[in-house]
């Protein structure tokens, strides 16, 4: 399974995002009781061992989709509603089915939704970003919604959004 996962979620391999639960600034949310990590870049190679640790639940990582050639094999629209109680995931699934979109909806850890698109080979990141941004109005999302960023600089200086 690890090899297949790496094929789907391949991207920038020189660093990866890390949810650091052991960081001194990590804390426990008093309302939910959940431990809140510090999110940071880990400037080490993204190896099969790191992927495997993520799949085993030992690490929580984030992968920069863009490789060094500004190409991607996957993209994600990350939907995090303000209120999770009334969040209608079926609305998004219905739109995907209605328009026969090449998206796979996956529930996120927080209870939101990731709308994932996968390519068989690395593809120009700007084209994929444009495609995903053009879908936002269908889902009644604005451009402030999060989706993957094209790699315009080092991972430590990326910009959120479009």
Which functions belong to the PLM regions below?
Residues 29-31, 37-38, 115-117, 156-158:
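Short, solvent-exposed polar/charged micro-motifs at secondary-structure junctions
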Residues 105-114:
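Short, conserved phosphate-binding/catalytic loop or strand-edge motifs used
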Residues 60-89, 119-162:
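DNA replication initiation modules
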Residues 94-106:
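Active-site palm subdomain of RNA-directed nucleic acid polymerases
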Residues 1-74, 82-92:
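DNA replication initiation on ssDNA origins
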